[in-house]
């Protein structure tokens, strides 16, 4: 069983992937900095969750 992400985290992640798909990588630390750069999220917890979700989606996109 996996974790269920909140709707706002998914929405932000999908918007980031739509607009900046080629910038994100499979590295969490890089994505964390990019999420900070492209959004106005002030909460560290929310930023990390969005970065983790983006990292997971990018890794799955590159596999297929």
From Swiss-Prot:
GO cellular component: cytosol; ribonucleoprotein complex; ribosome
GO molecular function, one term: structural constituent of ribosome
UniProt record, GO biological process: translation
Keyword terms, alphabetized: Ribonucleoprotein, Ribosomal protein
Keyword Ribonucleoprotein assigned: yes
Top-rank taxon, per record: Archaea
PROSITE patterns the UniProt entry points to: RIBOSOMAL_S17E
SUPFAM superfamilies linked to this entry: Rps17e-like
Keyword Ribosomal protein: yes
Gene3D superfamilies, sorted: Ribosomal protein S17e-like (1.10.60.20)
Family statement drawn from the similarity comment of this UniProt entry: Belongs to the eukaryotic ribosomal protein eS17 family.
Name assigned to this protein: Small ribosomal subunit protein eS17
Species this protein is from: Methanosarcina barkeri (strain Fusaro / DSM 804)
Gene (name only): rps17e
């Amino acid at each position: 069983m996996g974790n269920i992400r909140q709707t706002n985290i998914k929405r932000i992640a999908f918007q980031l992937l739509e607009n900046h798909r080629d910038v994100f990588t499979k590295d969490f630390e890089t994505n964390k900095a990019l999420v900070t750069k492209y959004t106005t999220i002030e909460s560290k917890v929310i930023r990390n969750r969005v970065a983790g979700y983006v990292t997971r989606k990018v890794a799955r996109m590159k596999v297929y």
